[in-house]
Structures are given as C-alpha cells and as structure tokens.
Amino acid sequence: MKYGSYIIEKREYVYIKRLLNISGYDHTLAHKLALEKLKHKIEDAIIVEENEMPLEIIRINSSVKIKCLRNSSVMPLQIVIPMDEDLKKQKFSILSPLPVSLIGYSKGDIVNLTFSKDKEEQYIIEEVKQDTTANIPI
C-alpha cells in the first residue's frame, strides 16, 4: 500500500457514513459483508480535504483499470454513487463488493480480490482517473 493507509476525502467520508446508516437492510450476504468492510475501512482511513487528496487514490467517480497478475486480464470500471450504477457500462456502486475492495487504494497497489467462491486473485491497480465533473449529493 503506497500511502500506508486508506485515504478518503472528507466529503466522501461524510457521504459514505450516511449511505452506511441507511443501507444496512440489504438482503444478500455479499453486500452485508461489503458494507461491514466499508465501515471498517473508513474508520481506519486517513481523512483529507479535497485539495490534499492525491489524484491517484481510488474514490467515488474514479475510473480504474485493474490487471490480474495471474493471467494479465484487464478490467476497467468506474466507482459511482448508488443511483448511477450501470453494470452494462461497468459503473459499480460504492456499496458493491468490488468498489469496497478498491476504495482508498492507489495506482500501483496490489489488492486481493475474490470474484468467485474461495478463488482469490491478486490484481494491480494500473490506472486511476478522476471524473471531476460528477458531484456527490451531500
């Protein structure tokens, strides 16, 4: 982990805390586990102001490319607010398991991701781009 800890921008921290307060009623186990992981992640994160936020940190509205270290397959995705989720366009809600696993990491970090039962793979974060035109409804 490049920065030694997860880094989250202050407004996004507030937004995620609000989402967690109203999102505890999801019925799938995977989402319940993701929400719990997100809760712990933001509790352990370094919270910074917008002007202190490194551009290479994965956050809400980031477009990301991750590459599997085993077979070099590349997966592009964007992390969005729940109402903007569109899986056909590779836009994943911040409350989904994959974005929860990636949020707070930076370009060059290696993360362990599980896409199927008990099959964990290592991925490197190859690219992080910020969409500065999208606003978070706080």
Model-derived segments and spans:
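Non-DNA-binding regulatory cores of transcription-related proteins
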Residues: 74-119
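Conserved NTP-handling cores and scaffolds of large molecular machines
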Residues: 42-46, 106, 132
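Conserved hydrophobic positions within beta-strands
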Residues: 125-128
